């Protein structure tokens, strides 16, 4: 069986905020996908488990995803939305 390698689509920047005792990091796109262009700044996430590198999902603007929450598929979390605890967002 062939292994599928997914190229990372974002990285963490040094811009952070504290929410509920957790450190969230602003993300930056590493490649073009969907409506996102390489270099675009996104919203803030706590860890890589919050936003899949697959699909066109993205956290944008001042949106937050943290805790055990996850955005995947083609979901877009934007404006001032907050996704946290065990919530999953998929489109």
Name each region found by the language model.
Residues 1-56:
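Terminal amphipathic alpha-helical/low-complexity segments used for targeting or macromolecular assembly
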Residues 52-91:
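A detector of tandem-repeat and repeat-rich interaction/domain scaffolds
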């Amino acid at each position: 069986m062939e292994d599928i390698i997914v190229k990372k689509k974002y990285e963490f920047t040094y811009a952070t905020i504290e929410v509920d005792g957790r450190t969230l990091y602003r993300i930056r796109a590493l490649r073009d996908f969907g409506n996102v262009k390489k270099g675009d700044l996104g919203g803030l996430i706590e860890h890589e488990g919050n936003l899949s590198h697959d699909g066109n999902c993205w956290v944008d603007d001042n949106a937050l995803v943290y805790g055990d929450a996850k955005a995947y598929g083609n979901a877009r979390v934007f404006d001032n939305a907050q996704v946290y605890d065990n919530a999953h967002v998929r489109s």
